[in-house]
Amino acid sequence: MTDVLRFGPELALFIAAAVVITVDALIPIAGKSAYDARRPIAVFLALAGVGASFAMSAILIAADEKGTVASGMIEVDDFSLFFSFLFAGVAGMIVLGSVDYLARNRFHAEYLGLVLASAAAMMTMAAAADLIMIFVALETQAIAFYVLVGFLKDGRSSEAALKYLLLGATSTALTLYGMAYLFGLSGQTSLDGIAQYVSNAGDENRSALVLAAVFLTAGLGFKMAVVPFQMWVPDVYEGAPTPITAYLSVASKAAGFAVVMRIFLVALGHGLITSDWANLFAAIAAISMTVGNVLALNQKNIKRMLGYSSIAQAGTFLIGLAAVAAKDPQLELGTSSVVFFLGAYAFTNLGAFMAIIAISAKIKSEQIEDFAGIYRRSPFLALGLAACLISLTGIPPTAGFVAKLLVFNAAVEANLVWLALIGVLNSVISAYYYLRVVLVMFTRDPSEATTFQPSPYLGFAMMISVVGLLAIGVYPNPLVDAADHAARIFG
């Protein structure tokens, strides 16, 4: 029974996914209005599942019910519980943001079921303490996303899904190669067992361990969307349903970083190759920030622009991980800064995409130029999107400013001043394309004068995001404390 309780947050979402699909199939409603009649029921059940997952996570924290599940393959600790809250919250926001989108594009309960199942899989990824469990959760999440990206079944969505599938299969192969090397060297699949081997390994094993780290970085780099493994990002972000683009940009990225932290800070964090992967992460961080920001400068499609922006943001996350290993003993500030950044980024990016969903539905375009004069037509959406873009830039008093400040401070503390300077310079570059959108919305004349407002679902989701990013910017202590507790497991 204890195992069931500890696995409760994930189990709640898996059960909710099955219930949503099953109940929808059993509802005896036919005819033209069937989709409109079934949609509210499925949305209610999906949100109930998210609420149950939140409640289970809160119970685990209140009861201090931590430990292992499935013979040690899953570790329930402050780190995994942080991501349980994060993924449940993101899934709930995506459900809210998808209501109107599904109404316009013909509702299917499988969509909501896949959103919930993928969130549960990502929770499992963050909690996995064994290579086998990591791989199973990784592939469960990936399969759900392959389907979700192509859910619209039009040419653009299908092309995006095919590219994502082909490149995802390649990343899976690379990840498996890295895991196979670690298993072959250590004879262990548990991260603690591998860590014990690595801490005692001699120089004769360095090359093989470095090769394993390179393969894992390449495979998981696809999930994190860092250079040079970012080829899929712009096309998939542009072609996928906009709520799924938001989901990919936040949840999939966070899950990738959670797995990287588990593997590299637990299994490979105390041994002879720590400096090797720290240098690798630092180089990838610098290149990702620069390439992502430079390519975003001339983008005309706002989803594509945010795709390149997400590559740059992933590079900023990696600064924190490079800082962890660049200092001995390990710098806890580096890990906690990454965890904090992921939480702050979720509020910021989700809010931006909620506004984009509402605006693009009205103007029938995702081109930045067509956002001209949106402030006069919908002040609420324009102000909300502006707040999110300002946060992505890293301007106070927003969550993005605090997050970048913590990451850059971690780099300086780890004697990676050059990397912090590159990060600051790239933040300045990013201000051009983020604030360009703000100027278009506030200073240009609109194409038509009719005003509009988002639906209650979208408006509520965006309001949560904007209030959250401003609250974190003004009073970051609660999220800082949560991130610190999550990071302590790697100490």
Task: List where the protein language model places each region.
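Alpha-helical transmembrane segments of multi-pass membrane proteins predominantly involved
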Residues: 1-491
